[in-house]
């Protein structure tokens, strides 16, 4: 049990996919200007990342490995992710049209979010079992969501702040992301 808790804490804080592994930077910078959009994207990404991680594990264990089709791993994982994203988009469109409009192009772009594919591939490389794969996917999603929501809240405050002209927009966003990354480096000794 403690092994699973350590894996979760490690994935959320210590080895955060955005700030440590630099995966998922496109939605991190693109959707983080408004807190409402960031929360919606976080929920959608959490669902997609967790489900895609579990399904990728199952595809790998029960299709690719038994038939010695390891060379199709990346392509099959992308297909799994695309199916999960399409399912998520249909659910979001039916349940919340406003959220669907707010997320815009970023919802279908979860398919190409390298963090989602990265989690699936790292699950295989690190030889996680089913429960570890689910926890790793969920932890990566929670870490992504945490960073995205914190960053979007900071960007909203920065939009109202008196920032010098050369630093407005993307420049101050990159500086803020760098400072967040430094803050998350403080968690490095938390899990060994």
From Swiss-Prot:
Q: Does the keyword Cell membrane apply?
A: yes
- How does the protein associate with the membrane? Multi-pass membrane protein
Q: Which UniProt keywords apply?
A: Cell inner membrane, Cell membrane, Electron transport, Membrane, Translocase, Transmembrane, Transmembrane helix, Transport
Q: Where exactly are the transmembrane stretches of this chain?
A: 5-25, 39-59, 65-85, 102-122, 134-154, 171-191
Q: Which InterPro entries does this chain map to? A: Ion_transpt_RnfA/RsxA, NqrDE/RnfAE, NqrDE/RnfAE_oxidrdctase
A Pfam family that the UniProt record links to this protein: Rnf-Nqr
Report the principal subcellular site. membrane
Coiled-coil ranges per the record?
Answer: none
What's one GO-annotated cellular component?
A: plasma membrane
| EC class | translocase
Compartments reported by the entry: Cell inner membrane
What is the E.C. number?
7.-.-.-
Listed under GO biological process in this entry are: electron transport chain
Subunit info here reads: The complex is composed of six subunits: RnfA, RnfB, RnfC, RnfD, RnfE and RnfG.
**In UniProt terms, what function does this protein have?**
Part of a membrane-bound complex that couples electron transfer with translocation of ions across the membrane.
Q: Which family does it belong to?
A: Belongs to the NqrDE/RnfAE family.
Question: Protein name, please?
Answer: Ion-translocating oxidoreductase complex subunit A
Q: Which organism is it from?
A: Shewanella sp. (strain MR-4)
């Amino acid at each position: 049990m403690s092994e699973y808790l350590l894996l979760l804490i490690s994935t959320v804080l210590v080895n955060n996919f955005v700030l440590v592994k630099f995966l998922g930077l496109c939605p991190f910078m693109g959707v983080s200007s408004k807190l409402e959009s960031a929360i919606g994207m976080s929920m959608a990404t959490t669902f997609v990342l967790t489900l895609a991680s579990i399904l990728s594990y199952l595809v790998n264990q029960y299709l690719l490995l038994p038939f010695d089709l390891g060379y199709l791993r990346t392509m099959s994982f992308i297909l799994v992710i695309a199916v999960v994203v399409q399912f998520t988009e249909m659910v979001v469109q039916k349940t919340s049209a406003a959220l669907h409009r707010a997320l815009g192009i970023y919802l279908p772009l979860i398919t190409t979010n390298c963090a989602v594919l990265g989690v699936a591939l790292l699950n295989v490389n690190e030889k996680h079992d089913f429960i570890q794969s689910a926890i790793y996917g969920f932890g990566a999603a929670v870490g992504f969501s945490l960073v995205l929501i914190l960053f979007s809240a900071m960007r909203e405050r920065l939009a109202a702040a008196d920032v010098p002209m050369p630093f407005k927009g993307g420049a101050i966003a990159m500086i803020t992301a760098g400072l967040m990354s430094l803050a998350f480096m403080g968690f490095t000794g938390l899990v060994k």
